[in-house]
A protein has these predicted regions:
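Charged phosphate-binding loop/patch that engages nucleotide di/tri-phosphates or the phosphate backbone
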Residues: 153-173
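Conserved AdoMet/S-adenosylmethionine-binding subsite of the radical SAM
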Residues: 1-10, 19-159
């Protein structure tokens, strides 16, 4: 990473495997910070203890949390038994951290409706930044998702327009 210093100003830590490892993540992040890089952490919000730890240690400069579905259908959408309290706790930790952040939802039409997106926004409440991301079926680990799609561009834009002002910034990606 020292060689890349002329080209890089930050590193993104992403992927559940790295983030969920209590031993590896903070140590790796400390080394990255010692090299003078900023760190963006991508999280699914399932490990609020780790999240608080890296925030408290000053190891993260930006946090992006995937908020995948309304809480009442979260486990169905992610196809796993997620502790919903952890999702809410992570969200609140991020909002109260003083660190720049965003929440984001990737729209898979077969899993989420426009009403679901409105529920997600209400569950998050006000905040810094909310991103609605188009689902790309060509980049998926689960082959079942190759048959899935995202909403039309008009519907995606409407999802942003319906709650202008709730978040300081709403983005369509």
């Amino acid at each position: 990473m020292n060689v890349g210093k002329a080209f890089l100003d930050g590193i993104v830590i992403t992927g559940g495997g790295t983030y969920n490892s209590i031993q590896i993540c903070p140590e790796l992040m400390k080394k990255i910070k010692e090299l003078g890089y900023k760190i963006k952490l991508d999280t699914n919000g399932t490990n609020p203890t780790m999240l608080r730890r890296v925030i408290d240690q000053g190891l993260v400069d930006y946090i992006a949390m995937d908020y995948k579905a309304p809480l009442n259908k979260y486990n169905e959408v992610v196809r796993a038994d997620v502790n919903l309290h952890d999702i809410v706790e992570s969200m609140e930790t991020i909002k109260n951290s003083g660190i720049e952040y965003e929440f984001r939802t990737t729209i898979v039409e077969q899993l989420l409706s426009p009403v679901d997106v409105e529920i997600i926004k209400a569950e998050i409440g006000s905040g810094e930044k909310y991103c609605i991301q188009k689902f790309n079926p060509t980049k998926t680990l689960d082959k079942d998702f190759l048959k899935c799609s995202t909403f039309s561009p008009q519907i995606m834009q409407n999802l942003i327009n319906t709650t202008k002002g709730v978040f300081k910034e709403e983005i369509l990606r």
